[in-house]
């Protein structure tokens, strides 16, 4: 049986742990500053859309590839009703080339071909995702899209490119992202393609409430 003195000590110790945890989280948030929007080439839809989707994704993740197709379909069905921001969360411990893939995709974006390069990364995961040496596919994809490979190499190695990705990873950590893809749909978490589709079933109601607009069911 715990006596009163022991109970007080336990409560005090627990309180100190709580305060310390909050202090660490606040310090991390302060060091990150305000959450940064994704760059324009990873942002789709109007700023005032009723449905706001933020995705944390990894190009070497099979579930992320499946989700990319679902997102594309949702954008086609709901159009300007959705604002989508794509953010990087490469799981570098299990996908050694995913950070490089994210960097090259961003650099393709700076040359106007983010979506096309991202699609090639997803479609060819089995060719580069678990390569033992730096994948040649990164250059091959650039060549197929007529991108300037030297410029992409310089861009990929630039501190600003890597820092942007790592800041997004840190933001994901702050939101307790621990799997990909993780979505925040109007602030509500969804993990994986199945939960994305589950949340998408509510989109008609959200749009109707926002604009009195009815959209035929997507069927996904």
Please name every model-derived segment.
Residues 1-23, 56, 139-220:
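C-terminal cap of thioredoxin/glutaredoxin-like
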Residues 22-35:
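Membrane-interface motif at the C-terminal end of an N-terminal transmembrane signal
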Residues 31-33, 62, 160-161:
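Short, flexible loop segments at the rims of nucleotide/cofactor-binding pockets, characterized by
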Residues 33-39, 163-166:
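Short gly/ser/thr-rich secondary-structure transition/capping motifs
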Residues 35-51, 76:
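A short beta-strand-turn-helix
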Residues 36-39, 123, 185:
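Residue-level signal for pocket-adjacent positions within structured domains
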Residues 42-44, 128, 190:
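Short clusters of hydrophobic/aromatic residues that line enzyme substrate/ligand-binding pockets
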Residues 49, 54-143, 148, 173-178, ...:
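Structural alpha/beta surface segment adjacent to cysteine/selenocysteine redox centers
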